[in-house]
């Protein structure tokens, strides 16, 4: 997990993408499912442009056969607005040949200076 964290701080997009299979499948929150390293590279490039000063902490949770789970928390500055943001979530990685073949992620984000209620999240 620490190695993966290091690839986000600062962003090392080529190394991140190298950790995935050529035919990887990504299901990331409400982003429409996409496939392959080219689309993954574009996804990380878009995120790195938007998430200035990204700081990430991942914690390993489970490993069963070829499936690994982790939870994460992160903070960044929104590059467009300058607002400090935070996020947290859970990820499931299905591995093949030492690389991620399927990446599924669910997460919540919000302003770092605001506390969200259940009602806020459900809007």
Give short role names for the model-derived ranges.
Residues 1-19:
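Short acidic-aromatic low-complexity motifs
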Residues 15, 38-39:
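An acidic, carboxylate-rich microenvironment
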Residues 27, 41-123:
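A beta-strand edge to alpha-helix "cap/lid" segment located at domain peripheries
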């Amino acid at each position: 997990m620490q190695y993966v964290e290091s690839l986000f701080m600062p962003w090392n997009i080529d190394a991140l993408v190298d950790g995935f299979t050529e035919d990887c499948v990504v299901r990331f929150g409400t982003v429409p499912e996409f496939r392959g390293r080219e689309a993954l590279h574009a996804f990380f490039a878009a995120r790195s442009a938007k998430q200035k000063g990204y700081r990430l902490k991942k914690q390993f949770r489970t490993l069963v056969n070829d499936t690994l789970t982790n939870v994460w928390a992160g903070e960044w500055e929104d590059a467009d607005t300058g607002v400090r943001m935070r996020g947290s979530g859970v990820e499931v990685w299905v591995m093949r040949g030492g690389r991620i073949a399927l990446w599924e992620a669910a997460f919540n984000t919000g302003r770092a200076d605001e506390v969200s209620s259940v009602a806020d999240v459900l809007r």
